[in-house]
């Protein structure tokens, strides 16, 4: 770990189509090997499919609702105390909540069986809004783990 000062947070420019920073972050998370135009096609294609499913809904609001239903409130962190390693439940900061939610939606989408990545992302977002899907299950598992280790909550740092 660097002993220098922490690098300053960079502001992310909102995406060109929806003017949303959250969507821009999602595009950046989907991007592989610096291919942003492909990542944008995937995300915008997924949003078009969401819009096609429910014409009255705003696709960005649907995405934000899905992100909210996937983002964890608590997680466990390992802490060594006297030779034993405890899984200590800690509250998740808002920025990390958003990042974890996006990461879990993308991981779940990559494991799905639909043809294109756009289809997978759209299906995972729609399932997350309904409270189903692999990303929501990941959140439930994280919360269960934190609940099971609640006894070690006094080991906070």
UniProtKB/Swiss-Prot annotation:
InterPro entries, per database record: Ribosomal_uS7 (IPR000235), Ribosomal_uS7_bac/org-type (IPR005717), Ribosomal_uS7_CS (IPR020606), Ribosomal_uS7_dom (IPR023798), Ribosomal_uS7_dom_sf (IPR036823)
CDD domains: uS7_Bacteria
Pfam families the UniProt entry points to: Ribosomal_S7 (PF00177)
GO molecular function: rRNA binding; structural constituent of ribosome; tRNA binding
Keyword tRNA-binding in record: yes
BP GO terms, sorted: translation
Cellular component annotations (GO), alphabetically ordered: small ribosomal subunit
Keyword Thylakoid: no
Keywords recorded for this protein, A-Z: Ribonucleoprotein, Ribosomal protein, RNA-binding, rRNA-binding, tRNA-binding
Subunit and interaction comment: Part of the 30S ribosomal subunit. Contacts proteins S9 and S11.
Its job: One of the primary rRNA binding proteins, it binds directly to 16S rRNA where it nucleates assembly of the head domain of the 30S subunit. Is located at the subunit interface close to the decoding center, probably blocks exit of the E-site tRNA.
Protein family: Belongs to the universal ribosomal protein uS7 family.
Protein name as annotated: Small ribosomal subunit protein uS7
